[in-house]
A protein has these predicted regions:
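Aromatic- and charge-enriched surface segment that lines or borders ligand/interaction sites
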Residues: 95-146, 177, 267, 315-317
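Extracytoplasmic/peripheral linker and loop segments enriched in polar/acidic and small residues
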Residues: 41, 168-169, 335, 370, ...
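Ligand/substrate-recognition segments at binding pockets and active sites
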Residues: 28, 230, 373, 377-451, ...
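Gly/Pro-rich hinge or "lid" segments in bacterial periplasmic/extracellular proteins
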Residues: 151, 159-165, 169, 174, ...
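Extracellular/periplasmic solute-recognition and catalytic clefts
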Residues: 29-30, 226-237, 254-312, 336-337
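Structural transition elements
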Residues: 345-382, 400-405
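Long beta-strand-rich cores associated with HINT superfamily self-processing modules
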Residues: 522-550
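N-terminal lobe/hinge region of extracytoplasmic solute-binding protein
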Residues: 51-101, 139, 216-220
Length: 550
């Protein structure tokens, strides 16, 4: 059942913001003063219980869209490469690879004796089928453009060539060749993305697009899908046919759907979870004092943002109005007093830490807040709004205390600086996705983007006109041209310059409002072993184990 929409009258927002700031002051601390985990029960060393955020939208590798979906898929499927503990690509289904002298051909050698979870032999052609399916317009994958560097991929996505002409071939059962338009320095990281997973052709032939369900899904990962209890959890069990099964320590993993961080925290303290998806802001101070050894915080290549619906008023063809709203968001105050978990104020789109790239910023980033307000008021009036005729706008976001606090705070900033009247509308995550994609009701919406691989192109691509997850509908031919040139650019310095120019251009257009850069935040029980923090925040369950407290 969808969550009841939350509507807040604009007149109450300043008072609500004050309440938010006061609540953040004491952290909403639990009464217990113990220094370690409480609620401990006997440890089941064979079953890991992971908090996993909102319920996944799909477990189909080529169709899934959300972070919570990809977390599960990484346990059910394995690509040619995987992500190592340091966030860098490592060998996975492919035991080795070679790269041509010109950087345009990668030849992957599969491990000997690979099998699907049902025992069928896994061959190189299964990777060809999976990647052809990814770019096939009939699949309607929102990640189709991720293979754009591959020969003919862009033309196939546009429907101009058949999927059979994709530059991925299997000359024999253990060799996958990926041919590129031009060198792509991030290709190995891209091959670790779940959307490039192999496809089990008999399952597709038998079940069609409904193959990714319990009792039907055949994967090649360390685990097999066992159950999906809607509104509760997804259960997976160990796959004895996985090539590295002897090193898998867990028999089962349960991924619990956790929409609200505070609820998830209560489950963790009660001993119902071993790992949390996030950490609640209102209890953060208490957690730092009492659960410091269980708290993991690490930089992450991810951006929290508000998107504008550019297909309809009031933001269609109104870059000045969009800029005005961005100018008056006090990101420093927001991250220190409202979120308070170490997030970094975002004055650009690409986070710090991306390899071989200098993140760009809004041109107003050096200005004082008072200077920003003066410019914003002039832009607001130029767009036709005033105290007598205020902008009335709605922010949509998925349910959760943290998202609500942020929306309340931003609405208060807009009201105080410009007189904007804002209504807030909270809905269940999948309902929010549907609202955004329909583009008939949303005006401003909350979203986030996690880099699929350690390269600025992973962020730049999201704003490309025809990219499947371009939620704002942003379309600038110059921006698209810069990205198209970057894709085929062999000179790394020139490629970097093109991507940096593209980011500056996009920021000037203001199709979205970057608010902060994430840090990954997890609570992890002392009896969980093998966890490695990294900038892409990827942890495979096969690398984890349970035992006595560390």
């Amino acid at each position: 059942m969808p969550a009841r929409p939350l509507r807040i009258a604009w007149r109450s927002i300043p008072a609500l913001l004050a309440a938010v700031l006061l609540a953040c002051g004491d952290g909403g601390a639990p009464e217990s003063k113990g220094k370690g985990s409480d609620g401990q029960a006997a440890i089941d060393v064979t079953t890991l219980r992971r908090g996993n955020g909102p319920e996944p939208d799909s477990l189909d590798p080529q169709r899934a869209r959300t972070d919570s979906s990809l977390n599960v898929i990484r346990d059910l499927f394995e690509g040619l490469t995987a992500v190592g503990g340091d966030g860098k690509p490592v060998a996975a289904a492919a035991e080795s690879w070679t790269v041509s002298a010109d950087g345009r051909e990668y030849r992957f050698r599969l491990r000997e004796g690979l099998r699907w979870s049902n025992g069928d032999p896994l061959v190189a052609g299964d990777f060809v089928v999976g990647m052809r399916r990814l770019v096939d317009p009939a699949t309607a994958s929102q990640y189709a453009q991720i293979l754009e560097p591959v020969v003919n991929a862009a033309a196939i996505v546009r429907g101009e060539r058949p999927p059979s002409e994709l530059g991925v071939v299997a000359p024999d059962a253990r060799t996958v060749i990926v041919r590129l338009v031009n060198p792509a320095p991030y290709l190995l990281g891209l091959m670790a993305h779940p959307s490039t997973s192999p496809a089990h052709s008999p399952s597709l032939a038998t079940h069609g697009e409904r193959f990714a369900q319990p009792g039907r899904l055949v994967g090649n990962g360390a685990f097999v899908l066992e159950e999906w209890v809607v509104g509760s959890h997804i259960g997976v069990r160990r796959n004895p046919n996985y090539w590295n099964d002897p090193r898998t320590r867990l028999d089962r993993v349960r991924f619990f759907h956790t929409n609200d961080p505070s609820t998830e925290f209560r489950q963790y303290r009660a001993g119902q979870l071993d790992v949390t998806y996030v950490v609640p802001a209102e209890q953060f101070a208490w957690i730092q004092e009492n659960l410091a050894t269980e708290l993991h915080i690490s930089p992450q290549l991810s951006t929290y943002y508000y998107g504008f619906n550019l297909s309809r008023p009031p933001f269609k063809d109104q870059p000045g109005l969009r800029r005005a709203l961005s100018l008056v968001i006090d990101r420093e105050r927001l991250t220190s007093a409202v979120t308070g978990l170490g997030e970094v104020p975002a004055y650009g789109w690409v986070p710090q830490g991306v390899s071989g790239y200098t993140p760009q910023q809004f041109d107003y980033a050096p200005l004082s807040y008072d200077e920003r307000i003066r410019e914003a008021r002039a832009l607001y009036q130029a767009a036709g709004y005033s105290d007598e005729r205020p902008l009335e706008v709605e922010i949509r976001y998925n349910t959760g205390e943290a998202h609500n606090r942020i929306a309340v705070a931003i609405a208060a900033m807009w009201k105080e600086a410009l007189g904007v009247k804002t209504s807030l509308y909270a809905e269940e995550f999948r309902a929010l996705l549907a609202s955004i994609q329909a583009r008939t009701e949303t005006e401003i919406f909350r979203s986030s983007w996690i880099g699929d691989f350690d390269d600025a192109y992973s962020f730049a691509q999201l704003l490309q006109s025809d990219f499947g997850i371009n939620l704002t509908g942003y379309s600038n031919p110059r921006y698209d041209a810069l990205l198209a040139e970057a894709v085929v650019q062999a000179d790394t310095a020139r490629r970097r310059a093109l991507l940096e120019e593209a980011e500056r251009l996009m920021l000037a257009d203001h199709p979205l409002l970057p608010i902060y850069f994430y840090v990954s935040k997890h609570l992890i029980k002392p009896h969980v072993h093998g966890w490695s923090d990294n900038v892409v925040n990827i942890q495979y369950s096969r690398s984890l184990s349970l035992g006595s407290d560390q």
